[in-house]
């Protein structure tokens, strides 16, 4: 029995999901939190039961050792030999990695070299890769990049209107993120629609604390709302999304903050938190708006307004849309936001049923049968995409 483990390593966390392949059955999943801090938390689900331990885990290598030991202790696996593939989520692949790759020493060096494009994420991703390679050196390891799916964007979509030499010399361009999620839901939408993805025009809305929209034509990403970094695009939980770049020196002058401090504000104190002054959590804002809090209502309106701008422009970009897909925490669970986004799209041929919209986290169509444009909730499954890519590369390696 072959097992593949999908890994998402953060700076102080390690999420994992173990699959039986090729059946794609989830065997177990869990997370190690607060790595390198006192009272680290190890959580694993075994036979539907969540087991939680508080234990000191000083670094990622110890976290990986512990994870593998727990898999054996809880009889999830009989020996390490059962694990035949490891897939690692890597946030930034730049232009170097247009698809998932087998990890060797050179690939690790290249991912490290791309760290200046994703200083918060890539170093953590590499730490996870190295920890697993040290303990399971002979198992096929694969890197799956958040940016890879968007590498099909044409130059007119990814170039900024800056001196062209900035792109040539420094790699300044739109990269886009959440690619694994956009790819998964676009392929799943094609299955649900019973049509080849190659003939579809899809608008995928990955709406979570981080949010991005993508225009997917013929199974390929043509454009997406995030940019050089995940700060661009729509308003998010704490991120501003697109702003006039001249605001940065203006804010510096007015507040005495450095460029780095302003960037910190744009990343961590803006978006729905910044506008509402209450919370970055959409559920809190929905509750407050229902009680008549104007600022909470305004934060939600700004979020929806920015989503509308992308839906309109991407529909024009693809000369029409066959389906709109909602995914991720907000997209899957907030009937309120879906309703606000869908209201006013009738001109595009979107006719949706309010009764069907009262659902959380399950896969379903929201449109009336006669609606030319279909509307679908598809819970994302980035871990499964990672496991599938491992399978593909394992067969070719």
From Swiss-Prot:
<keyword id="KW-0460">Magnesium</keyword>
<feature type="binding site">
    <location>
        <begin position="281"/>
        <end position="283"/>
    </location>
    <ligand>
        <name>ATP</name>
    </ligand>
</feature>
<feature type="binding site">
    <location>
        <position position="382"/>
    </location>
    <ligand>
        <name>Mg(2+)</name>
    </ligand>
</feature>
<dbReference type="InterPro" id="IPR023865">
    <property type="entry name" value="Aliphatic_acid_kinase_CS"/>
</dbReference>
<feature type="binding site">
    <location>
        <position position="15"/>
    </location>
    <ligand>
        <name>ATP</name>
    </ligand>
</feature>
<feature type="binding site">
    <location>
        <position position="8"/>
    </location>
    <ligand>
        <name>Mg(2+)</name>
    </ligand>
</feature>
<feature type="site" description="Transition state stabilizer">
    <location>
        <position position="178"/>
    </location>
</feature>
<feature type="active site" description="Proton donor/acceptor">
    <location>
        <position position="146"/>
    </location>
</feature>
<feature type="binding site">
    <location>
        <position position="89"/>
    </location>
    <ligand>
        <name>substrate</name>
    </ligand>
</feature>
<comment type="subunit">
    <text>Homodimer.</text>
</comment>
<dbReference type="InterPro" id="IPR043129">
    <property type="entry name" value="ATPase_NBD"/>
</dbReference>
<dbReference type="GO" id="GO:0006083">
    <property type="term" value="P:acetate metabolic process"/>
</dbReference>
<dbReference type="GO" id="GO:0006085">
    <property type="term" value="P:acetyl-CoA biosynthetic process"/>
</dbReference>
<keyword id="KW-0479">Metal-binding</keyword>
<dbReference type="InterPro" id="IPR004372">
    <property type="entry name" value="Ac/propionate_kinase"/>
</dbReference>
<keyword id="KW-0067">ATP-binding</keyword>
<dbReference type="InterPro" id="IPR000890">
    <property type="entry name" value="Aliphatic_acid_kin_short-chain"/>
</dbReference>
<keyword id="KW-0963">Cytoplasm</keyword>
<comment type="function">
    <text>Catalyzes the formation of acetyl phosphate from acetate and ATP. Can also catalyze the reverse reaction.</text>
</comment>
<feature type="binding site">
    <location>
        <begin position="329"/>
        <end position="333"/>
    </location>
    <ligand>
        <name>ATP</name>
    </ligand>
</feature>
<comment type="similarity">
    <text>Belongs to the acetokinase family.</text>
</comment>
<keyword id="KW-0547">Nucleotide-binding</keyword>
<comment type="pathway">
    <text>Metabolic intermediate biosynthesis; acetyl-CoA biosynthesis; acetyl-CoA from acetate: step 1/2.</text>
</comment>
<protein>
    <recommendedName>
        <fullName>Acetate kinase 1</fullName>
        <ecNumber>2.7.2.1</ecNumber>
    </recommendedName>
</protein>
<dbReference type="GO" id="GO:0005737">
    <property type="term" value="C:cytoplasm"/>
</dbReference>
<keyword id="KW-0418">Kinase</keyword>
<dbReference type="GO" id="GO:0008776">
    <property type="term" value="F:acetate kinase activity"/>
</dbReference>
<dbReference type="GO" id="GO:0000287">
    <property type="term" value="F:magnesium ion binding"/>
</dbReference>
<dbReference type="Pfam" id="PF00871">
    <property type="entry name" value="Acetate_kinase"/>
</dbReference>
<feature type="site" description="Transition state stabilizer">
    <location>
        <position position="239"/>
    </location>
</feature>
<feature type="binding site">
    <location>
        <begin position="206"/>
        <end position="210"/>
    </location>
    <ligand>
        <name>ATP</name>
    </ligand>
</feature>
<dbReference type="GO" id="GO:0005524">
    <property type="term" value="F:ATP binding"/>
</dbReference>
<keyword id="KW-0808">Transferase</keyword>
């Amino acid at each position: 029995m072959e097992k593949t483990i999908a890994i998402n390593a953060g700076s102080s966390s390690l999420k994992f999901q173990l699959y039986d392949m090729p059946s794609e059955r989830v065997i177990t999943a869990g997370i190690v939190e607060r790595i390198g801090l006192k009272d680290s938390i190890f959580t694993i689900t075994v036979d539907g039961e969540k087991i939680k331990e508080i234990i000191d885990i000083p670094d990622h290598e110890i976290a990986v050792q512990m994870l593998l030991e727990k898999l054996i202790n809880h009889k999830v696996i009989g020996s390490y030999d059962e694990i035949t593939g490891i897939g690692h989520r890597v946030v930034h692949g730049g232009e170097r990695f247009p698809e998932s790759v087998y990890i060797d020493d050179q690939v690790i060096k290249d991912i490290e070299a791309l760290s200046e494009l994703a200083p918060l994420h890539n170093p953590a991703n590499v730490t996870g890769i190295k920890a697993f390679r040290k303990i399971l050196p002979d198992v096929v390891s694969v890197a799956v990049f958040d940016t890879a799916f968007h590498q099909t964007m044409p130059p007119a979509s990814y170039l900024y209107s800056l001196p062209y030499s900035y792109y040539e010399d420094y790699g300044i361009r739109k990269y886009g993120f959440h690619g694994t999620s956009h790819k998964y839901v676009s392929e799943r939408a094609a299955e649900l629609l019973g049509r080849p993805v190659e003939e579809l025009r899809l608008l995928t809305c990955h709406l979570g604390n981080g949010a991005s929209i993508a225009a997917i034509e013929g199974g390929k990403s043509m454009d997406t709302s995030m940019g050089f970094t995940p700060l661009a695009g729509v308003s998010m939980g704490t991120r501003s999304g697109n702003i006039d770049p001249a605001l940065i020196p203006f804010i510096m002058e007015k507040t005495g903050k450095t460029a780095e401090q302003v960037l910190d504000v744009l990343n961590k104190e803006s978006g729905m938190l910044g506008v509402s002054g209450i919370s970055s959590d959409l559920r809190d804002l929905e509750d407050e708006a229902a009680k008549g809090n104007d600022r909470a209502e305004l934060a939600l309106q700004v979020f929806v307004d920015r989503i509308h701008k992308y839906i309109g422009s991407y529909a024009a970009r693809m000369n029409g849309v066959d389906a709109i897909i909602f995914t991720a925490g907000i997209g899957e669970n907030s009937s309120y936001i879906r309703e606000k986004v869908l209201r006013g799209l009738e001109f595009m041929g979107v006719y949706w049923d309010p009764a069907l919209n009262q659902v959380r986290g399950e896969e379903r169509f929201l449109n009336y049968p006669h609606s030319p444009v279909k509307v679908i909730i598809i819970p994302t499954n980035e871990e499964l995409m990672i496991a599938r890519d491992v399978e593909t590369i394992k067969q070719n390696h």
